[in-house]
């Protein structure tokens, strides 16, 4: 049995909720209602204090378990808390990094990336213990021993420069997606173009899914030198537009005090127009 790591409740298949009802449902004895409520609160960005508190409490749920020992409600609660943007959730998410459920740890790392709280760095770094040599696949499972992609991306996003010596070896990890995550983090932490160029190189590869990953990474780090390579990549325009939008947002943020739009920003806009 492979446990899913993604949310499984399309809105049209679930009950109609209001924020108040969703918060109440998190206390329900019906596990399916609780699971859906956690997903719904994240999906619709319900940022009320009561919602945040209820989701934080759900991170410690023991009732909703899979046959393999997973914690589905905890997973959805962890994912939702990242979307709500409240740093009150950080301590609970840090605790989730020690959960025996891989997918809870992954969701917690992804949300800590969104929240960008530096206090999470030591706990995230701990998940890199053993380095590349220990970063192997779990026997009989579809994942590695730790959610390395999410951990590396989180460390990059929160600016954990102390982790650079631990992240760099993952550029040589045998799993290409982990290599991409390491390159993404290294660029964020050093701003050295060599790491951005590693991601650009992936765009020329034969694996479409990996090209999509690299597009997302380049957009996330705002590597402006990749603009043309992104526009010309062999991938769906929707992925390329999202990546270019990321570049543009980074550039506009850097130019927030400028009186006019730079030529570089205009260049990205023109590339986006060419894909529409």
UniProtKB/Swiss-Prot annotation:
InterPro entries attached to this UniProt entry: ARM-like, ARM-type_fold, PBS_lyase_HEAT
Record's GO cellular component terms: phycobilisome
EC number: 4.-.-.-
This protein's UniProt keywords: Antenna complex, Lyase, Phycobilisome
A Pfam family the protein falls into: HEAT_2
Disulfide bonds: none
Domain of life: Bacteria
GO molecular function annotation: lyase activity; oxidoreductase activity
Subunit structure, interactors included: CpcE and CpcF associate to form a lyase.
Function, in words: Required for the chromophorylation of the CpcA gene product.
Protein family according to the UniProt entry: Belongs to the CpcE/RpcE/PecE family.
Protein name: Phycocyanobilin lyase subunit alpha
Provenance organism: Nostoc sp. (strain PCC 7120 / SAG 25.82 / UTEX 2576)
Lineage, top ranks: Bacteria, Bacillati, Cyanobacteriota, Cyanophyceae, Nostocales
């Amino acid at each position: 049995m492979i446990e899913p790591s993604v949310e499984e409740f399309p809105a049209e298949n679930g009950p109609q909720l209001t924020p108040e009802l969703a918060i109440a449902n998190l206390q329900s004895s019906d596990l399916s209602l609780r699971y859906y409520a956690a997903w719904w609160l994240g999906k619709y960005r319900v940022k009320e204090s009561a919602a945040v508190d209820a989701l934080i409490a759900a991170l410690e749920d023991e009732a909703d378990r899979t046959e393999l020992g997973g914690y589905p409600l905890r997973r959805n609660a962890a994912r939702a808390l990242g979307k709500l943007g409240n740093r009150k959730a950080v301590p609970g998410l840090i605790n989730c990094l020690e959960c025996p459920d891989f997918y809870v740890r992954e969701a917690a790392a992804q949300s800590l990336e969104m929240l960008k709280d530096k206090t999470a760095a030591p706990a995230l770094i701990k998940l890199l213990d053993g380095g590349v040599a220990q970063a192997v696949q779990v026997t009989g499972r579809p994942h590695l021993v730790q959610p390395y992609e999410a951990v590396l991306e989180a460390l990059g996003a929160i600016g954990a420069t102390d982790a650079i010596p631990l992240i760099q070896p993952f550029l040589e990890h045998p799993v290409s997606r982990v290599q991409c995550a390491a390159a993404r983090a290294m660029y964020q932490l050093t701003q050295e173009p060599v790491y951005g160029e590693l991601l650009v190189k992936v765009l020329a590869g034969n694996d479409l899914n990996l090209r999509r990953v690299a597009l997302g990474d380049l957009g996330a780090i705002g590597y402006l030198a990749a603009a043309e390579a992104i526009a010309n990549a062999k991938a769906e325009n929707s992925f390329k537009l999202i990546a270019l939008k990321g570049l543009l947002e980074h550039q506009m943020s850097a130019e927030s005090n400028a009186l006019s739009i730079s030529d570089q920003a205009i260049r990205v806009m023109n590339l986006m127009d060419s894909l529409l």
